[in-house]
Curated annotation (Swiss-Prot):
Organism of this sequence: Sinorhizobium medicae (strain WSM419)
UniProt lineage: Bacteria, Pseudomonadati, Pseudomonadota, Alphaproteobacteria, Hyphomicrobiales
GO molecular function, one term: metal ion binding
Active-site residues from the entry: 117
Cofactor requirements of the protein: Mg(2+)
Similarity-based family: Belongs to the NDK family.
Protein name: Nucleoside diphosphate kinase
Entry-linked HAMAP family: NDP_kinase (MF_00451)
Subunit-structure text: Homotetramer.
InterPro entries cross-referenced by the UniProt entry: NDK-like_dom, NDK-like_dom_sf, Nucleoside_diP_kinase, Nucleoside_diP_kinase_AS
Family matches, as SMART domains: NDK
């Protein structure tokens, strides 16, 4: 299996509850390694740009508002099958449907405040990583 990188974000609902360490530990315990990490407070413009793929969806305004409401922690994770592994550890988008022991089952407040975001494919991982990090910020 090839080592790959993925993008991960700890959302404002989780950072406001001081869950950054607990969530990062869950990711690391699953075999993922943090090779870049920074805490950012998204502007509305940054949130609109990052979530541009959803701009025509009815929840877009609420999503932008939420994502710019407090700090987030953006990370690059590395490991074997990092994209699939990160998504497995995060759990289903709706915490009610998430498997026991996943980040969203343990920490999410609702489908909207679901604590984490992760890339869903190699292409989106590359785009999302590039949105927040320059190459020199990623230290393997």
């Amino acid at each position: 299996m090839a080592i790959e990188r993925t993008f991960s974000m700890i959302k404002p609902d989780a950072t406001k509850r001081n869950l950054t360490g607990a969530i990062t530990k869950m990711l690391e315990d699953a075999g993922l390694r943090v090779v870049a990490s920074k805490r950012v407070w998204m502007s509305r413009r940054e949130a609109e740009g990052f979530y541009a793929v959803h701009k025509d969806r009815p929840f877009f305004g609420e999503l932008v508002e939420f994502m710019s409401s407090g700090p987030t922690v953006v990370q690059v994770l590395e490991g074997e099958n990092a994209i699939a592994k990160n998504r497995e550890v995060m759990g289903a988008t709706n915490p009610a449907n998430a498997a026991e022991g996943t980040i969203r089952k343990v920490h999410a407040l609702s489908i909207g405040e679901n604590s984490v975001h992760g890339s869903d494919a190699p292409e989106t991982a590359a785009e999302e990583i590039a949105y927040w990090f320059s190459g020199t910020e990623i230290v393997g």
